[in-house]
């Protein structure tokens, strides 16, 4: 064994990311904007733990063939399995059922937090990501679904997206259920095949109609040589499914007529069309008809949806990993799930909701150059010119004076010299630095260097000697004028921005 201790390799787990100060600021700004819209619609905050008992979460995870294969799980001291939540909806169902007697009905809540998926990571596909959900539990009316859709549109506009940047795409799972019943996919024994069909339809934007046709049939071979087994439907059954996907027309009325034709006399299917018609009337009455559109290809991957389903899609182009232009795509979605709470209460409790993917939104806003950027400067840095205890106490006193005046400030606590300290201040984006050597301390004086003005003047003064002699953007003041002098510099810098 080597006497030299082996170093542990610093490495980030696959599928996870670190977030910088700038990213956190952008996230917090976006969250505040979305929260403002949610609360305007009457929703209240709720927080649930990131761990739930595994059986509470249920077996609803999309894109997984094996139950609970996509979750992170552990056993507690009682040998009960617990899992990290994979969405924010299943925990809400548990909370509502557990507190059924005391909660108002309908119950409007919003939840924000990280969710976890134990899936293969890839470009833009993470194992931990943030969602911001809003749900209405306890009402069967599709007016609730319509309100959720309108709130989703308002949230995107609050973030700076324009009408032409996005669309809320709307469908109804009852219509899809009608088509699946018409081709014989009913009963528990056909559950896996139904799920394969749902996944195939969900890939329409990615693979197109022909790709979906292959996935509904024997399967699809991608460019890398990987083969995805299909749903093994017959040609006539495939045609029935594709007829649904191509039902979108120029107007909402024409699309609804096409959907009526697809479902025929199927009672549940016709009910689904009627619900879409009711929602469309609400959108038209409130000026949302061009932002929320019926799209028969929307299915949503989760099995628990029972009625209207919706997806927020960004319409602008971005470059993919191969340098090709593609539509940015989905940044959130949701729908009605009337059976989820029934797992705990034995009776259906109507519910509907929407989830926004915060991480996807950040990427989208970056592409539009609309990501919130922190405009406030870094802290004022008091340099450590002398490390004698008396001097350090004086430096700390300066820092506290600035903080008490509401000015961000810090004392340089490293061991480097003046040159490295100035570089540190630049890296911290400090607006100015405070300097007091032994002579200044004896004279009760302080030097303050305006780094913003100094940078500007450095582009104008080319001669080093002139620069050293003029000491531009640097002033000397009495100790008692420290706060006022720094405030004057900050006011001047702020005025120059406008």
UniProtKB/Swiss-Prot annotation:
Originating gene: hisS
InterPro entries per UniProt: aa-tRNA-synth_II, aa-tRNA-synth_II/BPL/LPL, Anticodon-bd, Anticodon-bd_dom_sf, His-tRNA-ligase, HisRS-like_core, HisRS/HisZ, HisRS_anticodon
The keyword Aminoacyl-tRNA synthetase is assigned to this record: yes
Family: Belongs to the class-II aminoacyl-tRNA synthetase family.
GO molecular function: ATP binding; histidine-tRNA ligase activity
Catalytic activity: tRNA(His) + L-histidine + ATP = L-histidyl-tRNA(His) + AMP + diphosphate + H(+)
Any single GO CC term annotated in Swiss-Prot or TrEMBL for this entry: cytoplasm
Subunit relationships: Homodimer.
Pfam families per the UniProt record, alphabetical: HGTP_anticodon, tRNA-synt_His
One GO biological process term: histidyl-tRNA aminoacylation
Native source species: Bartonella quintana (strain Toulouse)
Keywords: Aminoacyl-tRNA synthetase, ATP-binding, Cytoplasm, Ligase, Nucleotide-binding, Protein biosynthesis
Name of the molecule in the record: Histidine--tRNA ligase
Top-level taxon in the UniProt lineage: Bacteria
Record flagged with keyword Cytoplasm: yes
HAMAP family per UniProt: His_tRNA_synth (MF_00127)
Location of the protein in the cell: Cytoplasm
EC number: 6.1.1.21
């Amino acid at each position: 064994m080597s006497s030299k201790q082996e170093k542990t390799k610093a490495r980030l787990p696959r599928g996870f990311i670190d977030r910088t100060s700038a990213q956190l600021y952008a996230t917090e700004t976006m969250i505040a904007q979305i929260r403002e819209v949610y609360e305007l619609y009457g929703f209240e905050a709720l927080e649930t733990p990131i761990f739930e008992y595994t059986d509470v979460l249920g077996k609803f995870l999309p894109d997984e063939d094996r139950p609970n294969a996509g979750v992170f799980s552990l056993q507690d001291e009682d040998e009960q399995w617990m899992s990290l939540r994979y969405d924010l909806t299943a925990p809400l169902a548990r909370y509502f059922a557990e507190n059924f007697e005391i909660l108002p009905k309908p119950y409007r809540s919003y939840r924000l937090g990280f969710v976890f998926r134990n899936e293969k990571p890839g470009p833009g596909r993470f194992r931990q990501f943030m969602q911001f959900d809003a749900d209405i539990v306890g009402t069967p009316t599709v007016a609730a679904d319509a309100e959720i859709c309108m709130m989703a549109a308002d949230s995107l506009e609050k973030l700076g997206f324009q009408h032409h940047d996005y669309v809320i795409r709307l469908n109804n799972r009852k219509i899809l259920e009608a088509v699946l019943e018409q081709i014989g996919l009913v009963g528990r024994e056909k559950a896996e095949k139904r799920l394969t069909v749902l996944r195939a339809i969900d890939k329409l934007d990615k693979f197109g109609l022909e790709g979906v046709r292959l996935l509904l049939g024997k399967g699809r071979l991608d460019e890398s040589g990987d083969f995805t087994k299909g749903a093994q439907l017959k040609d006539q059954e495939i045609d029935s499914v594709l007829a649904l996907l191509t039902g979108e027309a120029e107007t909402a009325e024409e699309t609804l007529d096409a959907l009526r034709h697809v479902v025929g006399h199927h009672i549940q299917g016709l009910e689904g069309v009627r619900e879409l018609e009711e929602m469309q009337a609400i959108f038209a009455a409130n000026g949302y008809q061009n932002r929320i559109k019926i799209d028969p290809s929307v299915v949503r991957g989760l099995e628990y949806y029972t009625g209207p389903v919706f997806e927020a899609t960004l319409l602008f182009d971005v470059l993919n990993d191969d340098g090709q232009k593609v539509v940015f795509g989905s940044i959130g979605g949701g729908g009605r799930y009337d059976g989820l709470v029934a797992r705990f209460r034995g009776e259906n409790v109507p519910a509907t909701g929407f989830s926004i993917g915060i991480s996807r939104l950040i990427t989208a806003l970056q592409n539009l150059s609309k990501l919130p950027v922190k405009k406030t400067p870094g802290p004022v840095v008091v340099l450590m010119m002398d490390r004698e205890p008396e001097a350090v106490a004086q430096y700390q006193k300066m820092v506290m004076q600035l903080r008490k005046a509401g000015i961000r400030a810090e004392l340089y606590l490293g061991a480097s010299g003046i040159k490295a300290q100035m570089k540190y201040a630049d890296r911290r984006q400090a607006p100015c630095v405070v300097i007091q050597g032994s002579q200044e301390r004896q004279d009760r004086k302080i030097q303050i260097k305006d780094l913003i003005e100094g940078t500007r003047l450095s582009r104008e003064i080319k001669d080093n000697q002139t620069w050293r002699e003029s000491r531009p953007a640097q002033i000397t003041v009495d100790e008692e004028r420290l706060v006022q002098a720094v405030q004057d510099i900050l006011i001047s810098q702020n005025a120059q921005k406008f």
